[in-house]
Amino acid sequence: MAVSLWQQCIGRLQDELSAQQFSMWIRPLQAEMDGDTLVLYAPNRFVLDWVRDKYINIINQFFTEQMGSDAPKLRFDIGSRPSAKKPSVPAPIAPTRVANTQTKATVGTTFNVQAEPMANANHRSNINPSYQFDNFVEGKSNQLGKAAALQVAENPGGAYNPLFLYGGTGLGKTHLLHAVGNGIIKNNPNAKVVYMHSERFVQDMVKALQNNAIEEFKRYYRSVDALFIDDIQFFANKDRSQEEFFHTFNALLEGNHQIILTSDRYPKEIDGVEDRLKSRFGWGLTVAIEPPELETRVAILMRKAQESGINLPDEVAFFIAKRLRSNVRELEGALNRVIANANFTGRPITIDFVREALRDLLALQEKLVTIDNIQKTVAEYYKIKMADMLSKRRSRSVARPRQVAMALSKELTNQSLPEIGDAFGGRDHTTVLHACRKIAQLREESHDIKEDYANLIRTLSS
């Protein structure tokens, strides 16, 4: 009875959570009765803690609504339910067997058409050891991406395969790829982990064709334990490369070997890539990495300054973070310039000093992002008239874009709420605040709004 109740609860959670949240946290759970207690089994400690912290109240409330005082007690455990014949999550990848001529430190490399790279005992991993989960600054914009990456590192080839991360340039996708690779290697030094840009895969295939070594190419890429490919959108219109990757993809998944892909856009929006590939990209878990919000931008600056041995005043970090919003790479580049100028001149890092050091960059940002620019961009995106943005019309087709534009104005400009309200037809600041809160809520609940907002930020920040 209680297990059946859990199935009903799953239906409720699927309605209330986003597809990403449901796939990451609820789908991996298994349920079984133990006396008067319903035990929920999570695949690992990370999932267990997250579900217990975030969703236990929703679950208990549903049980009480359905069964009142007869509702079962709830307990969490790690693993699979004892009666399960098979685990719901595939077993972790087995380490690749290596020949006696190879070192145990074999991890990954790029393809070499002259000889199979695995025959070289001295080749090194191309996973960057400096990219770790510990130095990845987490915020709302990348929380799901980091959580998924952590689980893949702990259980490669398991729950989320393939993992597809998408978002604009400089948001931390590559950092997460390397962090996963480092996590896999830490747990299994014999694992063969390969990271590369999609253009390198294409180059390797072309060289293999030129050197009559296509079989070696296939053997190498289909033998890895984990394959991470950055910027998969560069496969567009490269038919032979897509054909080879299609078969490589299938071979790796059949062997429960982990695949992680990144792109600057949602899989179905990648032009020039075969539908059968785009379909496979969505077989596992697809997660958006969005531009960092203000608090995360500040945290990134403070972490970077700390790593550089620089004391960055809080007010300076906020000043920079409020004005540079597009991506992490831009933030770090700006801070590097400030630090270099401070070291060269010997002057303390103050807001006035930062204004001077980043004069051209700040001027460009202020010129690019204005409320008027946001209104025009949003009106064009949603195909409404600019006049509607300022009107009193309340139909959803107009009100929702107006709310999106208000939220973007708060995030991307330095204008106050009253100033934003004035720019939207003399509206009160409480209307702007309500719009910002409503859009923040919808970005959690609606995939379409989340995508629209991310697309608009990319457009306005480019």
UniProtKB/Swiss-Prot annotation:
InterPro entries found in the cross-reference section: AAA+_ATPase (IPR003593), Chromosome_initiator_DnaA (IPR001957), Chromosome_initiator_DnaA-like (IPR020591), Chromosome_initiator_DnaA_CS (IPR018312), DnaA_C (IPR013159), DnaA_dom (IPR013317), DnaA_N_dom (IPR024633), DnaA_N_sf (IPR038454)
Binding site for ATP: 170, 172-174
Family annotation (Pfam families): Bac_DnaA, Bac_DnaA_C, DnaA_N, Hda_lid
Domain III, AAA+ region, as annotated region: 126-342
Molecular function terms, GO-annotated: ATP binding; ATP hydrolysis activity; DNA replication origin binding; lipid binding
Region span, Domain II: 84-125
GO CC annotation terms, alphabetical: cytoplasm; plasma membrane
Zinc-finger among keywords: no
Keyword tags: ATP-binding, Cytoplasm, DNA replication, DNA-binding, Lipid-binding, Nucleotide-binding
One GO biological process term: DNA replication initiation
Biological role stated in the UniProt entry: Plays an essential role in the initiation and regulation of chromosomal replication. ATP-DnaA binds to the origin of replication (oriC) to initiate formation of the DNA replication initiation complex once per cell cycle. Binds the DnaA box (a 9 base pair repeat at the origin) and separates the double-stranded (ds)DNA. Forms a right-handed helical filament on oriC DNA; dsDNA binds to the exterior of the filament while single-stranded (ss)DNA is stabiized in the filament's interior.
NCBIfam families: DnaA
Similarity comment text for this entry: Belongs to the DnaA family.
Comment text on domains: Domain I is involved in oligomerization and binding regulators, domain II is flexibile and of varying length in different bacteria, domain III forms the AAA+ region, while domain IV binds dsDNA.
Quaternary data: Oligomerizes as a right-handed, spiral filament on DNA at oriC.
Protein name, entry field: Chromosomal replication initiator protein DnaA
UniProt organism field: Shewanella baltica (strain OS155 / ATCC BAA-1091)
Gene expressing this chain: dnaA
